[in-house]
Every structure is written in structure tokens, then in C-alpha cells.
């Protein structure tokens, strides 16, 4: 082997070793106790190198280190790069930390980036009920009705967990409440699936009431019969049967139609400008 080739190989190995140490330092796995992120980058660590499935920027978001996220971006980390799971750093940040989300968005992160399952960061923020991340993403242009591989929206993801705070914010931004996924489920039916497992709390009940107000009318029955899992809970079955049997009133159906006609915008601001009495504005905003 020529000396020049040996030097090149040694240089590559050294750079790889530094990059691996960078990942470990960010994740607080102290193989080298005196390592710090800035010194490793100054020494030649590649801020865009992938180790296994991990990239430094994604790792910093996983541990909610906004200062480290900003440092990596300042040093050239690719803000929309994909890791081994085809996820961007924003997908991880959206689950955990508003500060990381804000930094990434400031540096040009795509709020509508898709992972391998076509999930957006907003799907994950809604699922984890990280309400401030939900709001930050929506304010930065995230699609409120983005569809994953199963045609589920962020509202569906929030509803299946009974995440009241996230559901409320998504509805404020005009989320479509009557969306149907590929197997016939709606946001409200996803929430019912949680309630029938006996996992509902007062917050989940409030979430159901909010979705019911937003949808105006819903139907869970097939050929007039409730699903078996609902029928196993007599009290819940009776409540849902009454709601499904009652036709939507003109008032509730008009509320749904008006909200939808306002389009994809922040509805509290849009409704505020309508020439309507205060009581009707509150009604449109699902406050009663």
C-alpha cells in the first residue's frame, strides 16, 4: 500500500471515529469523558455522518438539547436529512421539545416532511400530545389534514389517544373532523375504540364531547347494529346509540358547514371578524 493511500485511509478512519464519538457525546454515552461537541466538530467530526441509524442532529433532538441542535446547524448539519428510519430531525423534536422544533424551523426544516410511513412531524406531535409543538408546526405551515399511509390525519392520531389539548388546537386550525381512513375509521370512532377498552378518563370524555360538537352528527352502526366491542359495554352502547340515532340538527350541521367554509386558517381569528353576535361566535368555536 502506498503511503498516500495509507494516509487517506487513516484520515477516513480518524474522521469516522470522531463522528462516532460525536454521537456518543450528544447522547451522553461518555466513552471519552473529556469529549465535548464543539471540540469534536473542530477536530473534524462530520456533523452529517450516520452511525447505524443515527445522525448527530437527530440524536440531539431525541435528547431535547436545543443548544446542541443549534450548534450542529451552525456547523453545517443538514436540517432536512433523513436518518436510518427515513425520519427528519423534526420528526423527533415534534414528539419531545418545542425549543428544538423552533430552532429547526428557524433553520428551514420542512414542517411537512414525510417519514417512511408518510407520517409528518405534526402526526407525531399530536400523538404524543405535545400541544406547543402542534401549535408551532401549524403556525409554520404544517398541513393540518396531512394523510399518512392509512389516510389518517393528525386529528385521528390525537383522537385515538384522547389527547384533548392537541385535538382542540387542531380543530382551531380547521382540521377536518369527518375524514375517513382506508378502513373506514374517523377521528371520533378512533376515540370510541379507546373508550370501549375502559381506558377513558374525564379528559377523554371531554375530548369526545368536543369532537361530537365539531362533527355535528356521526354514525358508528352498520346495518343498524353497534360494533361488538361497543355492545359489550351496555352503558356506553346506550349513550352512543342515542347519539347515532338522533339526526343532526340544522344548528349543528350549519356549524360544521360554516367552520368548513372558513377553510384552513386559525378559526378563532376568522370567526372574530364575522358580523355575528358573541354567542354565535362562541358556538362556531365549539365553546358551547
UniProtKB/Swiss-Prot annotation:
Subunit comment: Interacts with TBK1; this interaction promotes TBK1 proteasomal degradation.
ANK-type repeats, residues: 52-81, 85-113, 117-146, 150-179
Organism: Homo sapiens
Purpose of the protein: May be a substrate-recognition component of a SCF-like ECS (Elongin-Cullin-SOCS-box protein) E3 ubiquitin-protein ligase complex which mediates the ubiquitination and subsequent proteasomal degradation of target proteins. Inhibits IFN-beta production through the IRF3 signaling pathway by targeting TBK1 via 'Lys-48'-linked ubiquitination, leading to its proteasomal degradation.
Domain SOCS box: 235-288
Tissue expression summary: Highest level of expression in skeletal muscle. Also expressed in heart, brain, placenta, liver, kidney and pancreas.
Modification(s) after translation: Phosphorylated by TBK1.
Family recorded in the similarity comment: Belongs to the ankyrin SOCS box (ASB) family.
GO biological process terms held by the UniProt record: intracellular signal transduction; protein ubiquitination
Name by which UniProt lists this protein: Ankyrin repeat and SOCS box protein 8
Keyword Nucleotide-binding: no
Listed Pfam families: Ank_2, Ank_4, SOCS_box
Listed CDD domains: SOCS_ASB8 (cd03727)
